Each structure stands twice: as C-alpha cells, then as structure tokens.
C-alpha cells in the first residue's frame, strides 16, 4: 500500500490517483509520473485510505496524518467519491497502541465526516480473545495471512453492513480459524457502528 505519509511530497496533478484507468495497479510516489486518464466505463464509488500504524500516534507524524487525511478527503469528495479510512492495528509487541490509535482515527474521521473501517479494533479483539491466532508477520507489524483475512472481512462488513459468517473462502487457513475470524469481524463491525 501507499501510506498517506508517502504521498506528502507528491504533487497531485489532475487527481490522477482517483481517475487513472490503471486504478489499483500502481503506486503513487514522487518518481511516478501518473497521467490523468478519463475512463468513461469506470466509476469509483469509494476510496479507502490507509496509513502506517505508527504515523497517527507518533509525535513527529501525527499532525501530518491529520493534515493529509483532510487534504485527501477533500480532494476525493470534490470528485464525487466517498473517502474512507482504515483504522490500523497496534503492533503485536505494543498492544497498548490501540488506545492512541482509536483516539486519533476517530478524531480524523469525525473531523472529516468520513467512514472509519475498524480493522485495528478487530485485531485488538482477536489478540485478547484468541491469542492462538497469529495476526502478524515476524516483524510484529505487518499482517500475516490470518491478519489479512481478518482485515478483508472487516472491510467487507463495514462497506456492505453484512455478516461475513459463512463465507467459504479459506485463503489457506483452517475452517476453524476462518470461522473465528469471521465471528470477530462481524462482532467488531456490529459493535463499532452501533456506538
């Protein structure tokens, strides 16, 4: 993914990151010459933004996180598209990060009136209720296959407000593990949007 902070120095030309016909097949960075390509056959309904887990809570990057969530949300809305933001997860070896992440992500989405996708909340719940499921790569930061499955389930539930329970896709995981992850995703989405 291209975190919001990597986009800080890029020059947004013609909103090419929204309207490019190769949407989803490239990264945006300062050396990538993204051209605006109008595609009359493709309408984008939503853009999901995601930053690193440390950026919203680190003293040196927190202000930029909020600045660029606003900037990109405004640009996306101006193009008639709904911006959304993924709440990232605490590091495996720093579970207390959830409290600061929750605060900063809720503040950013409330200030910009955008949807928050609570993946971090689902990771937190899984870590507390099913510690036998490893959601992380060996670096304790990036998601494992199980973490990716959980994230996808939370995104689906958040976007469509439908349960994932019963989905037969295993993604290389055991059916027992996917059942637990689906239950956690559904519970997280239900509880998060009811509050």
List PLM regions with ranges.
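Single conserved hydrophobic/aromatic residue that forms the stacking wall/gate
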Residues: 1-14
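Generic surface-pattern signal
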Residues: 28, 110, 128, 186, ...
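Alpha-helical cap/lid subdomain in secreted, periplasmic
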Residues: 32-145, 157
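Conserved catalytic region of serine esterases and O-acyltransferases that act on ester linkages
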Residues: 142, 153-195
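Active-site oxyanion/phosphate-handling segment shared across diverse enzymes
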Residues: 148
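General structural signal for secondary-structure boundaries
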Residues: 14, 21-22, 61, 100, ...
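Charged, often glycine-rich, active-site loop that binds/positions anionic groups
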Residues: 15-32
């Amino acid at each position: 993914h291209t975190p919001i902070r990597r986009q800080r120095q890029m020059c947004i030309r013609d909103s090419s990151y929204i309207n490019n016909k190769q949407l989803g097949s490239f990264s945006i960075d300062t050396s990538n010459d993204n051209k605006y390509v109008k595609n009359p056959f493709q309408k984008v309904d939503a853009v999901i933004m995601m930053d690193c887990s440390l950026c919203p809570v680190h003293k040196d990057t927190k202000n930029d996180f909020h600045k660029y969530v606003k900037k990109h949300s405004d640009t996306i809305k101006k193009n008639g598209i709904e911006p959304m933001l993924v709440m990232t997860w605490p590091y495996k070896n720093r579970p207390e990060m959830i409290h600061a992440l929750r605060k900063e992500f809720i503040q950013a989405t409330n200030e910009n009136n955008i949807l928050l996708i609570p993946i971090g909340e689902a990771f937190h719940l899984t870590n507390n209720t099913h510690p036998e499921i490893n959601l992380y790569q060996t670096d304790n930061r990036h998601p494992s296959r199980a973490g990716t499955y959980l994230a996808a389930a939370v995104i689906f539930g958040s976007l469509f407000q439908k349960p994932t329970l019963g989905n037969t896709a295993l993604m290389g995981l055991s059916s027992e593990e996917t059942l637990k992850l689906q239950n956690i995703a559904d519970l997280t989405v239900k509880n998060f949007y009811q509050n």
